[in-house]
UniProtKB/Swiss-Prot annotation:
Source taxonomy: Bacteria, Pseudomonadati, Pseudomonadota, Gammaproteobacteria, Alteromonadales
Regions annotated as coiled coil: none
Subunit-structure text: Interacts with the C-terminal region of Rne.
Localization terms from the record: Cytoplasm
Listed name of the protein: Regulator of ribonuclease activity B
GO MF terms held by the record: endoribonuclease inhibitor activity; enzyme binding
Native source species: Pseudoalteromonas translucida (strain TAC 125)
Gene Ontology CC terms, in alphabetical order: cytoplasm
């Protein structure tokens, strides 16, 4: 299992060091992937039922030509590791339960 806290701390500190505004809300995108579309769909539905804003699934092509399904969950959040980790912990557990992969999160620099 990934060390999501350490990864989250690195992302947040990098954004803040680059001058991103710590006082505004950010759109945090949580990424999910799976080769099995029905499992991915089940995870998306479960996240929606928990109140998350679920984006439409998309089929992606990997570098080796293989196909994989993905979707994102978008959450407005402070740029705060503890706040973000609340969602990471819930969503990573949901991914395990639904047998899909939680592929981390990201956001964009904001001035």
């Amino acid at each position: 299992m990934e060390n999501w806290r350490e990864i989250s701390e690195d992302i947040v500190s990098s954004l803040l060091e680059d001058g991103s505004d710590p006082e505004i809300l950010y759109e945090v995108e949580h990424h999910f992937v799976c080769e099995d579309f029905p499992k991915l769909e089940q995870a998306a539905l479960a996240a929606f039922k928990l109140g998350y804003d679920v984006e439409e699934p998309a089929e992606l092509e990997l570098e080796d030509g293989a196909k994989i399904w993905s979707f994102d969950i978008v959450v407005e959040s402070e740029l705060d590791v503890d706040v973000i980790m609340e969602d990471v912990d819930k969503l990573a557990a949901l991914a395990v339960e639904c047998e899909v992969e939680y592929d981390g999160w990201g956001t964009y620099f904001q001035e």
